[in-house]
Amino acid sequence: MKRFVPYLGIVAAAYFFTLAVAFVNESSVQQTPTKVPTASSTVSIVPSYTVPSITLPNLKEAESPVKETLPPKKVTAPTKNTVSAPVPAAASVPVSTPVSVPVSNAALDASASTLRSALVNIICYAPLGSGFHSISGSGIFIDPKGIILTNAHIAQYFLLADRNVTCTIRSGSPAIDKYGAKPIYIPPAWLYANAKVLTQSTPNGTGQYDFALIAVSKSADRNPLPDSFPSIPLAISPPTSGTPVIIASYGAQFLASSQVLSFLTPTIVFGSIKEIFTFVKNTVDVLAFGGSAAAQEGSSGGGVANAFGELVGTITTSTIEGPTDTRSLTAITASYIRAEYATETGEAIDLLLGQPTSISISNFAQRIPELEAIITAQLN
């Protein structure tokens, strides 16, 4: 069975500095009915605000592709438009792997500190009348040269500079403007499969191909760029079920647009991997977690780290209704990202990470016009 659920978003009118918190919803790709975790993870949560309780919908109703409607926060009433989700290859059953051994709390604490330092908030502003929404999401520095891993549905906005879309990289608590950035890789497969997502109020997807790389290109103020950025390395091997992890993001579902701009703080969660899934074959492609404060709009592009200080996953999907401790959060694995990048480019991702960012930015800039055309064709 293929299960498609919506990208998370907080959308407001551009006149009010609109923000749509872009974040893909929970998608477990499997042949059997989707199993949605209802119990909270065994976690210690450090939320940045009180999470309100809202009614949890029946998430197990569908036995076929699901089209759940995302109710974004808008100045105008939300619509019920949906977008065709990417069609992955036939999905297989959950992958069976051994349960990982316990690790020390000290190691988890150290990894949490590293992950939090590497966490960024990404905000892109779309002009009024542009036909698409402003967004707020998360990202993680994975290289000290200033390379950020995030989602493709966030990074696509960096293709729209010639349409007066501006993006800024923020960090800190609360998050403040720090850097400008430019894209250095967005999977064409995601753009082709999600060409209409840009203009949809309630798009949905699976999380497949939903990763991208952007690189810091300038400072947001007059301060010089640092010689090195705090970062966490991209893991090579996938984790196992039961592995303790740390999840970090700039969740913003319960904040008004003005609060996102002025009072957005990180959410850090200690938990464990509940299940693992594959998109196509017996590879560990998707990590599933129980509910937590990280399961909310704005967490898209956030990071999942293990106790060894490695980034093992990037948040892509989640359910978004009900108390956060009853939701389901998923991430694509670092090993999936590595494999998919190699499949699309014929090269290891480490080659891209190893070259100067100025070269990566220049090389990718040559492709921006053709990639932009894919996602803006419906506007012309």
Model-based region annotation:
Residues 1-36:
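Sec-dependent N-terminal signal peptides
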Residues 111, 158, 196-205, 216-263:
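Active-site substrate-binding loop(s) of clan PA
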Residues 115-132, 217-231, 256-348:
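Active-site region of chymotrypsin-like
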Residues 125-127, 144-147, 151-155, 170-175, ...:
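Solvent-exposed coil/turn segments that connect beta secondary-structure elements
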Residues 114-119, 132-137, 143-145, 149, ...:
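Extracytoplasmic
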Residues 143-206:
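Catalytic-histidine neighborhood of serine endopeptidases
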Residues 39-144, 151-152, 209-212, 356-380:
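N-terminal activation segment of mature serine protease catalytic domains
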Residues 164, 171, 175, 180-192, ...:
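C-terminal cap/linker of serine protease catalytic domains
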